[in-house]
Design a protein with these regions (language model features):
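Bacterial N-terminal signal peptides that target proteins for export
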Residues: 1-10
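Immediate post-signal peptide segment of exported/extracytoplasmic ligand-binding proteins
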Residues: 22-34, 135-142, 315-334
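Bilobed "Venus flytrap"/periplasmic-binding protein-like clamshell domains
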Residues: 27-55, 67, 90, 117-186, ...
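Periplasmic-binding protein-like
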Residues: 31-36, 43, 109-119, 211-246, ...
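An extracytoplasmic/periplasmic, membrane-proximal ligand-sensing/linker region
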Residues: 38-39, 45-49, 244-334
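Pocket-flanking alpha-helical
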Residues: 65-102, 202-208
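Short helices/loops that flank or line small-molecule/ion binding pockets
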Residues: 71-85, 98, 116, 181-196
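A ligand-binding cleft/hinge motif common to bilobed small-molecule-binding domains
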Residues: 89-99, 162-163, 189-190, 194-215, ...
Length: 334
């Protein structure tokens, strides 16, 4: 009798496992793209609790999608392999323009800061103490630049540090490399690279994961404020999918457990956003292009004038949209 009961119990367990597997297989899948700001192993550990909650509360099977660079996530969205993603602003701009992406939410720093800042860092023992020092000694320095689709690692320093000073980093330095935020910071800490781009969020994260490393770094330049990172979904998701995702994101962070999950991601509750979040980033990209054209000695006068006129017209349109948005925001606040 006992043996028969054991066989029935075992068969029931196998059936339950089989049914659970079938139920899991029948769940609609949402692929969540995560940009490679640090090693995939570190990212998996901090994202897993959030994605698990997302699965439970939406009813979707949420799978993390990692790629070695930002372009991999953008391409994944372009070919419908990524449904929703956390991007920086520059990468989000590429996703909106080239991968039918649409911004629906914005991250908010756990500290409540309205955004974050791009940094240039050097080793604490370095004689390079300022942006001016770096530019004056560039020919003897190895420079760690960011991913070409990174806002704080590439676009922002590309304009404020290099374009405004008429400097091409590829030509100016002894050697230039492109890496993730974490790789750049560790390379500077270990004296493998002389100067590199980084950001304040990455610094806070490094203080948690490898607290001895930030002590080997010093900040030699800090950018103007960068808006918080956007969350982007494919604009061809169904209304049902968008409503479920929107409901999850804007309610998440209501209890202590969820707040802890967000805090581990260095965030507090999400806030609604849209593609207009990118207007300052688009302006920055156009400013950089305009500076590059103005300083391009290989362009003839007529061609240069035509390119500058076209860029100025684009900038004027952007400035008008930004002014209209500010007026609307002020009216809503009033």
């Amino acid at each position: 009798m006992l043996k028969r009961f054991s066989r029935v119990l075992a068969a029931s367990a196998r059936l339950a496992g089989s049914l659970a597997g079938m139920a899991h297989a029948d769940q609609p899948v949402i692929n969540f793209g995560i940009i490679s700001t640090e090693s995939s192993q570190n990212l998996k550990s901090i994202w897993e609790p959030f994605l698990k909650d997302m699965s439970q509360q939406t009813g979707y099977q949420v799978k993390a999608f990692f790629a070695p660079d930002y372009a991999g996530i953008i391409q994944g969205m372009r070919f419908d392999k990524v449904d929703i993603a956390w991007y920086g602003n520059k990468a989000a701009m590429e996703a909106v323009d080239r991968a039918h992406g649409e911004i629906f939410a914005q991250t908010v720093a756990a500290s409540g800061a309205p955004g974050y800042w791009s940094l240039l860092i050097a080793n604490k023992d370095s004689k390079i103490d300022s942006l001016e020092d770096m530019l004056a000694n560039a020919k003897s320095l190895t420079f760690g630049n960011g991913d070409p689709n990174s806002t704080s690692g590439y676009l922002v320093p590309g304009y404020y540090v290099f374009a405004k000073n008429n400097v091409d980093p590829v030509k100016a330095f002894k050697r230039t490399l492109n890496s993730s935020h974490e790789v750049n910071a560790l390379a500077v800490a270990n004296k493998q690279v002389d100067v590199a781009t980084f950001n304040t969020e990455g610094m806070e994260r490094l203080e948690l994961t490898q607290p001895e490393k930030p002590r080997q770094l010093k900040v030699i330049w800090k950018s103007p404020l960068i808006p918080g990172d956007p969350l982007v979904w494919r604009n061809n998701l169904s209304d049902e999918q968008k409503n479920k995702l929107r409901d999850f994101f804007f309610k998440y962070g209501a209890n202590a457990e969820q707040k802890k999950v967000l805090a581990d991601l260095q965030w507090s509750k999400f806030q609604p956003s849209d593609d207009d979040q990118l207007l300052p980033i688009r302006q920055l990209e156009l400013f950089k292009q305009r500076t590059d054209v103005a300083n391009n000695a290989n362009l003839g006068a007529e061609e240069k004038a035509a390119k500058l006129k076209a860029l100025d017209e684009e900038l004027a349109k952007l400035e008008k949209r930004m002014a209209e948005r500010e007026q609307k925001t002020a009216a809503n606040a009033g």
